[in-house]
């Protein structure tokens, strides 16, 4: 049994698809759990805050992540505030528009340049009793000048991984 510690339906769907079918998966909605306050200063800290909180509330092993987009030209913003850039309802169309507006303001002709970015994911697994593990992954890439693709969620339509011409939003998960 494993609790996926997220209230983000896109994340839940993608994580479930990656796990073996013999693991009984629970979501935070199965326990009517709201997300804890993410007051960490890093993706790693926020990932662990969520995993510990949800594990303690459910008494299950919990896997939680914290992930986001870091854009070099914007001093690594939105960073740990990636979801919050979408406002109260985590509206990623709004967040993407905010990225484009900030880039327009910083470098008016940014669409003709390669804007370096990273996608960061910290993943924590927390066991009842206090044992935990946290790992961090980073994908280098750039920002697309337009939204492209409908696969995935979040910033996927504007993040182009290094070595690709397509956004995450255009690439099927493997």
Residue ranges and their predicted role:
Residues 1-3, 9-173:
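Anionic-ligand binding patches
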């Amino acid at each position: 049994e494993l609790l996926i510690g997220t209230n983000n339906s896109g994340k839940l769907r993608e994580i479930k698809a990656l796990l073996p079918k013999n693991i009984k998966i629970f979501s935070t909605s199965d326990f009517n759990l709201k997300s804890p306050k993410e007051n960490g200063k890093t993706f790693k800290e926020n990932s662990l805050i969520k995993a510990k909180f949800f594990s303690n509330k459910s008494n299950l092993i919990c896997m939680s992540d914290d992930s986001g987009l870091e854009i070099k030209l914007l001093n690594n913003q939105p960073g740990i505030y990636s979801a919050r850039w979408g406002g109260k309802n985590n509206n990623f169309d709004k967040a993407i528009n905010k990225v484009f507006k900030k880039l327009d303001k910083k470098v008016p002709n940014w669409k003709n340049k390669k804007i370096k970015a990273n996608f960061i994911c910290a993943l924590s697994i927390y066991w009842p009793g206090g044992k935990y593990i946290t790992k961090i992954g980073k994908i280098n890439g750039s920002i697309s000048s337009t939204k492209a693709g409908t696969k995935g969620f979040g910033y996927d339509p504007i993040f182009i991984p290094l070595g690709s011409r397509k956004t995450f939003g255009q690439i099927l998960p493997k």
